[in-house]
Amino acid sequence: MKNIVLTGFMATGKTTVGKKVATTMSFGFIDTDKMIEKMANMTVSDIFEKYGENYFRKLEKAAVKKAARLKNFVIATGGGVVLNPSNIVQLRKNGVVICFVARPEIILRNIGKNKDRPLLMVDNPEEKIRQLLKEREPFYRFADYTIDVSDMTIDEVAEEVIKAYIRLKKG
């Protein structure tokens, strides 16, 4: 069976929903950011701080390559995984790519006081979210299916992911 690949902006519920979907479908679950942290033996924030975004993206590419080889997995990706088109090509080989989108104020609310978001360590995080969303929006269009999670519960999103997967894996 094909993998279920969850993409989308940070704090849209990819990991939380991914774990729920994996349990429901009896799939494995993997988070590419956690893979990167294991590879580097440090947090994503520390990687950004110590080595910068370019180094992080190299590690991310390696993690995606590894994750894409798996079968029967839900793969939650980092918010910027779409910035490298080869990542999406890799993930699509054996996966259905589902993108989560949300309004900026929902993303900001979900992030809350979480300090583990290196790209948002700025004076005006909501403005930064809007800017990043605008930059990434064209890349998110490469998904097989998009879900606006803004007004949905975790259970509703998980159900929508499963329905979309069942429809799309046939194609």
From Swiss-Prot:
MF annotations from Gene Ontology: ATP binding; magnesium ion binding; shikimate kinase activity
Predominant place of localization: cytoplasm
Gene3D superfamilies named among the record's database cross-references: P-loop containing nucleotide triphosphate hydrolases (3.40.50.300)
Binding of Mg(2+), residues: 15
Cofactor note: Binds 1 Mg(2+) ion per subunit.
Cofactor: Mg(2+)
GO cellular-component term (any): cytosol
Catalytic reactions of this protein: shikimate + ATP = 3-phosphoshikimate + ADP + H(+)
Family: Belongs to the shikimate kinase family.
Function description: Catalyzes the specific phosphorylation of the 3-hydroxyl group of shikimic acid using ATP as a cosubstrate.
Subunit comment: Monomer.
Name by which UniProt lists this protein: Shikimate kinase
Organism: Thermoanaerobacter sp. (strain X514)
Name of the gene: aroK
